[in-house]
Structures are given as C-alpha cells and as structure tokens.
Amino acid sequence: MYFWEGGYQRALEFAQWKQSRGEIKEPMVLGAYIHLGRCFDLTDTWATTQLGHYYSRLASLLHREGEPIPRNRRARPGDHDLLLRNLDCAVLNFCLTQLAADTGKGRGHFQTVRGVFVEGEPAYPGARIHSRSHIQIAVRDPACILGYFLPAGGYTVSEE
C-alpha cells in the first residue's frame, strides 16, 4: 500500500486523476497512522548506495538472461515526468529481496520504504524544488498500519 506523507492535496489530485481514467468511482483521501518499523529510507545515503550496488547486480543478471533492463517511462505522450517507474520498482524489489537473502532475514526484513519523488514543474525559474514533489511511503507489512482517519477538510467515505 502506498501513502503520501503529509500530502493531502497531492493524494487528492492522484485520486481525481484515477477517477478521470475510470479506475475509481469517487476520489477521496484516507489518512493512516503508520509505524515505519524497519524502514528502507531513500533519503538515507546508505539506502541509495545499496540501490546502486544492486542495480549493477540486476543489470548483470538480466544481461546474462538476455532480458532488457526495465525503463522508467512517461504515462502519456507529452508528460514531463517519468511516472511509470518500472526501472525504479524493479531495482527496489530486487534490492530488498537480495538484502533479505544476503542477511538471512527473509522477506520481512524491511517493513516500509520511504522516498522523495520529484515531480511537476519547477516552483520558480531555476528551482530544483518542483510543484508536485512528495514523500511516499510503501507499506510492505500491514502490521505497520496502526489506524486510519479522515483528514480534516477531507471527503467523507460513501456508504457504497
């Protein structure tokens, strides 16, 4: 399960985008109390160093098997951002699986993954701060979700 950290408006925009694609009926945002537990935190240089290492291992493995390396892609022609993160997802999953195997701790070694995603246009000319950037948390172990809530000013949950 994926969550935006403190990003109500961005989460709502995502839900509205899903509605426009016919993937959901009613957009809404649900908050969650999350205990990060053993977190693979992509804002920590240890984690990004691991990703670089395991990317090399994955690339070598795919090359030996004659498989292409996945690529991050735009969702639609004309999109500025590479929203379809096939490469990032493959590297993260390979890295986490291999770290668990290498340490003998099994799949549950990392319960959550936390990272910054830079998206949108620059906030002002010359900026490296972008209009749709957000922190996202992937919860791999549902036990890390301690509870749910409706954010202040948010939509109500329908009875359907």
Describe these PLM feature segments:
Residues M1-K18:
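Extended catalytic/binding region for NAD+/ADP-ribose chemistry, centered on the ART fold
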Residues K18-V29:
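Cytochrome P450 catalytic domain signature, combining two hallmark sequence patches
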Residues P27-E160:
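Active-site and NAD+-binding cores of ADP-ribose-processing enzymes
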